[in-house]
Amino acid sequence: MFSGDKEDSMDDRCVEITVGDIKYLASSSVFFQSNKKLLSEMLSYVKENVVGESIMDLYSGVGTFSALFNGENKTIYAVERERKCLELSRKNAPSAISFSDDCARWGKNKGKHVDTVIVDPPRTGLDKEVISLLEEWKPEKIIYISCNPVTASRDLSLFSLYAPTKVKVFDLYPGSSHTETVCLLSRNK
């Protein structure tokens, strides 16, 4: 849209989306789940499976998972390379320590041990470097969220120190072949 000589981009307009008791800001230039009811169930499931006081949210997007811990006495690290997503993440999850970087590059330079790592990679899945870093950091639990069962299966097979203990599918797009899968991974004993 144009207003006089100045371009007025719809992409920069934010909308507030309430999921459960959390208010998120999103825009048309970023991804946000459209099925709020099932998203709320998935977020509750993720939150109830987090362990410890320190959490890393890799591929954090607009802070969907980081925002679960607003106001709690936890240390949250959010890593996202997309600038617009990170701007919204800082608003949605103000208590998270946010980093604008590629997850593998950030992990090599600044990664650290945390209790739980939440990963929600794009459809292409995790970089092998990220899997290696996760095993190096040795978190107590990894929560892997995937929208692509093929890359999720591939990624899970590449872990040598972790194994899935529980897998739950959320049909966020009823009537289509697209689902979100949450895999809980624990260290092998």
Provide a role label for each language-model segment:
Residues 1-189:
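Rossmann-like S-adenosyl-L-methionine
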